[in-house]
């Protein structure tokens, strides 16, 4: 468990960007707030109004608060929050994992319980800002009176139980701009109930935004409580207890701790035959389970590790071998990993992100394995955006095979360096010799071979020729190493494909691109069923690859599918007969 004081947290935060603001003075006026937001106040005798106002000014220390606001009117956003924390001697607690669960980019809806009041919102804004600065919070009109916080707020009129259309439009625009937006679904501070201190009934607004914009939701539970006096008064008067909240904030000295969960996606909720109200109840239950170490309501994938420092990536890639440049100014590098490599961590993060985007992925924080450390990586780097656009992993088998003996002796490799063998060997067994009329020249292939695999293109670079640029890099590598004459490696079919689409693809590529140079035996082989084979033989010509490929594409399009990019590219890369799909393995 890690505890952060305001000073510790401030050191982690980035400095606020300088902005041009007209200096404003602002203050809290209890009398005006009562007249504006508590209608019965206007019906009271004037002497009683003055008495109530005077009493509340003392309780909330209005003069002290206004002095602080006046002295710090030059501060904005997160700087103002940190100054307020210093003034209140306030700190909060969280685990390192809690911070890792916050998505570092992309639109996300953060929903939380609301135990205290303003401190909940300020601390949540501050916590999220440690990961990303593009965060806003849906807040009531009272909080929006504090001018320095205005850039962080999306005001709604919770007190009247009604939100203007423009308020909702502003929230949607923030989310569509890939910002993080914080919601308190209860709309008011938690109350004492038979089950303890809990929120009142949640509004479903945050779920509506998630469904409409197809955005993930991240739960954050806040473990904190107000004083016994507050809950006692709240039983009789919600308005009176609300007026006590400033005093509760000033006097707060209890423990304040965050518990977070990885995001919950709209796809997880869509199959549930439940009303929106019932789904909100499940989300609420999931949130309240977080501090109890109980099984969560929703199974979540681990959040991706946060992006590596852009400058660290750039510096590390400067030492890599440059293979070339693209027509639009990107650089192509051949990267050799080393211990504690930030580039390798970023490759693992982006690889997992890319595979999750198509319904796959390991479910881990990053997709790396033991082979990444001694394989090399072709990387396309965008120096304008400081982003890795995509990568291919290379196993330099032609270097690793000993020159004085076969690469394969009794099915065992003899390598200079990698004791773990090849990545493809974890999925297939290779054999020398003759089988099914095929002379297997595995040793010849390996001695001049380059293993390819684990390729990806970062989603924001899809459709921007990034895969072509990776092949430009592979071509440049082969030009520098003319001994390489064979390319081989695994290529995957998504598990999310309909069974019929999968069967059609396997049949087509087995039929027209059979094994030719060597036999690969799958460790967990995939076999077409008799009925699937019968259907394919009826559907396909069987001897005309162009005609059957057109048929394959048409059949896949009816299922809203298409031929996987790498299958299409590999088969088009060589003249007919120059590429084979030797075997199909089921990856566990």
Regions found by a protein language model. Give the residues of each.
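Short amphipathic alpha-helix that is part of the acyltransferase structural core
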Residues: 323-377, 381, 387-396
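Membrane-anchoring hydrophobic helices of lipid-metabolizing enzymes
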Residues: 2-108, 114, 121-123, 130-132, ...
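A short helix-loop-beta-strand connector motif used in the catalytic cores of GNAT acetyltransferases and
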Residues: 370-379, 402-403, 577-578, 588
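Conserved N-terminal entry element of GNAT/NAT acetyltransferase domains
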Residues: 301-338
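Non-catalytic C-terminal accessory region of glycerolipid acyltransferases
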Residues: 30, 165-312, 534-542
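Glycine- and acidic-residue-rich phosphate-binding/metal-coordinating active-site segment common to enzymes
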Residues: 148-192, 196-213, 218-221, 234-236, ...
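Acyl-donor binding region in acyl/amide transferases
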Residues: 352, 362, 400-577, 582-585
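Glycine-rich, often proline-containing surface loops adjacent to acidic residues and nearby aromatics
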Residues: 104-109, 149-151, 181, 259, ...
């Amino acid at each position: 468990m890690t505890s952060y004081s305001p000073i510790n947290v401030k050191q982690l935060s980035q400095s606020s960007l300088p902005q041009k603001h007209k200096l404003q003075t602002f203050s809290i006026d209890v009398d005006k707030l009562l007249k504006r937001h508590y209608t019965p106040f206007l019906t009271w005798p004037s002497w009683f109004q003055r008495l109530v106002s005077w009493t509340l000014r003392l309780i909330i220390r209005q003069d002290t608060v206004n002095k602080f606001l006046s002295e710090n009117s030059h501060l904005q956003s997160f700087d103002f929050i940190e100054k307020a924390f210093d003034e209140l001697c306030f700190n909060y607690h969280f685990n390192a994992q809690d911070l890792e669960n916050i998505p570092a980019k992309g639109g996300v809806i953060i929903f939380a319980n609301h135990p205290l009041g303003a401190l909940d919102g300020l601390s949540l804004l501050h916590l999220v800002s440690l990961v990303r600065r593009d965060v806003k919070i849906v807040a009531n009109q009272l909080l929006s009176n504090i001018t320095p916080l205005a850039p962080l707020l999306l005001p709604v009129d919770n007190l009247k139980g009604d939100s203007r259309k423009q308020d909702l439009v502003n929230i949607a625009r923030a989310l569509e701009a890939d910002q993080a937006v914080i919601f308190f679904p209860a709309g008011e501070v938690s109350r004492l109930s038979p089950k303890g201190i809990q929120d009142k009934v949640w509004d479903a607004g945050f779920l509506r935004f998630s469904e409409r914009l197809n955005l993930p939701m991240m739960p954050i539970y806040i473990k904190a409580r107000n004083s016994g006096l507050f809950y006692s008064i709240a039983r009789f008067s919600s308005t009176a207890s609300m007026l006590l909240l400033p005093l509760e904030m000033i006097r707060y000295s209890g423990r304040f701790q965050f518990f977070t969960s990885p995001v919950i996606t709209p796809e997880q909720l869509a199959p549930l035959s439940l009303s929106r109200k019932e789904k909100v109840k499940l989300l609420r239950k999931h949130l309240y389970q977080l501090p109890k170490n109980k099984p969560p309501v929703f199974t979540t994938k681990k959040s991706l590790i946060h992006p590596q420092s852009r400058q660290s990536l750039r510096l590390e890639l400067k030492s890599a071998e440059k293979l070339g440049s693209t027509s639009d100014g990107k650089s192509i590098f051949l990267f050799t990993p080393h211990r504690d490599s930030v580039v390798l961590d970023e490759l693992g993060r982006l690889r997992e992100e890319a595979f999750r985007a198509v319904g796959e992925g390991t479910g881990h924080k990053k997709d790396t394995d033991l082979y990444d450390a001694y394989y090399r990586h072709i990387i396309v780097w965008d120096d304008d955006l400081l982003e890795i656009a995509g990568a291919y992993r290379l196993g330099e088998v032609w270097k690793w095979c000993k020159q004085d003996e076969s690469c394969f002796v009794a099915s065992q490799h003899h390598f200079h360096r990698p004791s773990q063998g090849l990545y493809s060997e974890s999925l297939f067994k290779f054999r020398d010799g003759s089988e099914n009329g095929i002379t297997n020249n595995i040793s010849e292939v390996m001695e001049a071979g380059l293993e390819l695999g684990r390729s990806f293109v970062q989603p924001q670079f899809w459709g921007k020729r990034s895969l072509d640029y990776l092949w430009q890099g592979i071509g440049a590598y082969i030009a520098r190493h003319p001994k390489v004459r064979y390319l081989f490696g695994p290529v995957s079919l998504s598990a999310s494909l309909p069974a019929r689409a999968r069967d059609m693809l396997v049949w087509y590529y087995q039929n027209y691109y059979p094994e030719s140079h060597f036999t690969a035996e799958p460790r967990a082989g995939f076999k077409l069923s008799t009925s699937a084979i019968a259907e394919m033989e009826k559907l396909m010509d069987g001897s005309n690859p162009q005609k059957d490929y057109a048929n394959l594409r048409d059949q896949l399009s009816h299922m809203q599918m298409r031929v996987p990019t790498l299958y299409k590219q590999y088969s088009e890369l060589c003249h007919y007969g120059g590429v084979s799909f030797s075997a199909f393995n089921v990856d566990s």
